[in-house]
């Protein structure tokens, strides 16, 4: 979400929060666009003094200008930075193009009071930007493309590579409950990425369904937070415990924004169904 401090400043008149039509009328669309592009370029110079919340504030407005209303799915549970950026952009809703540019420019000015954009008639070259604008590089970590020989079982799990994972588990070359450095199992990863069929494969090989990572979160926490109802239902059907809490004291129904999933989990917990033995037969997915 955007920084409360920034939003408070916006309402003070220094940065528009509800719209500043008079200010927009003082600049032509071309002038505003030119100043916005210069501000986007200058962000690279002030990123080191900006807080994470200020960068998120800028990121959201950059995306609103370049793309418009948020039109991408919510990132997975593991992608914390991606989720924060998505939430900041999503919160803008139908924010106008002009309002987003104006607030972006004014915020950059606040970060560097000595900076001012060039007038339109002065020479100006549009900056080369990375995906999402320069500010993205301050928040977004691009995953390296691994060579096939460098991949491990977790990479295959993230890629939803059924054959590789199934073969490794079937031959016993990999323990189904193996964990990464953060205590996350293959089941955690499959649930985070929404790989329903792969979840079934892993459960077939008797994965510890209530295994907790270093944060105390179970695969059910992950599926709930990432809003995959089919996987939540699958986990519950095979004995996942919806009453387990993570290190912050949250149960799975408390980490999701989905009312449907929250209701499903609470209903399951109230019925005590997680105390029943899991299904005796789980067919291997084709």
UniProtKB/Swiss-Prot annotation:
UniProt-annotated binding residues for an acyl-CoA: 59-63, 85, 104
Major subcellular location class: cytoplasm
Subcellular location: Cytoplasm; Nucleus
Keywords carried by this UniProt record: ANK repeat, Cytoplasm, Lipid-binding, Nucleus, Repeat
Domain ACB: 32-117
Source organism superkingdom: Eukaryota
GO MF: fatty-acyl-CoA binding; lipid binding
ANK repeat ranges per the UniProt record: 182-211, 215-244
Keyword Repeat recorded: yes
SUPFAM superfamilies: Acyl-CoA binding protein, Ankyrin repeat
GO cellular component, one term: cytoplasm
Family matches, as Pfam families: ACBP (PF00887), Ank_2 (PF12796)
Main function: Binds long-chain acyl-coenzyme A molecules with a strong preference for unsaturated C18:1-CoA. Does not bind fatty acids. Plays a role in protein N-myristoylation.
Stated name of the protein: Acyl-CoA-binding domain-containing protein 6
């Amino acid at each position: 979400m955007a920084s409360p401090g920034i939003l408070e400043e916006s309402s003070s008149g220094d940065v528009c929060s509800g719209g500043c039509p008079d200010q927009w009328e003082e600049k032509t669309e071309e002038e505003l666009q030119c100043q916005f592009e210069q501000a986007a370029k200058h962000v690279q110079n002030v990123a080191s003094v900006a807080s994470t919340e200020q960068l998120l504030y800028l990121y959201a407005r950059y995306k609103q200008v370049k793309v418009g209303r948020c039109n991408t799915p919510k990132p997975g549970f593991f992608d914390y930075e991606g989720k924060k950026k998505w939430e900041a952009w999503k919160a803008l809703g139908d924010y106008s193009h002009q309002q987003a540019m104006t607030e972006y420019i004014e915020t950059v000015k606040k970060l560097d009071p000595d900076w001012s954009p060039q007038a339109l008639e002065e020479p100006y070259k549009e900056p080369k930007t990375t995906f999402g604008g320069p500010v993205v590089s301050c928040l977004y970590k691009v995953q390296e493309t691994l060579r096939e020989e460098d991949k491990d079982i977790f990479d295959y799990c993230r890629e939803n590579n059924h054959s590789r994972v199934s073969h490794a588990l079937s031959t016993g070359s990999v323990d189904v409950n193996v964990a990464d450095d953060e205590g996350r199992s293959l089941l955690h990863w499959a649930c985070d990425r929404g790989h329903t069929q792969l979840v079934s494969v892993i459960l077939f090989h008797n994965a510890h369904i209530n295994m907790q990572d270093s944060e105390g979160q179970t695969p059910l926490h992950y599926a709930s937070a990432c809003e995959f109802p089919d996987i939540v239902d699958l986990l519950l059907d095979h004995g996942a415990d919806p009453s387990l809490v993570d290190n912050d004291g949250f149960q799975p129904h408390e980490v999701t924004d989905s009312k449907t999933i929250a209701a499903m989990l609470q209903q399951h917990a109230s019925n005590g169904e997680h105390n029943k033995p899991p299904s005796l037969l789980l067919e291997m997915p084709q």
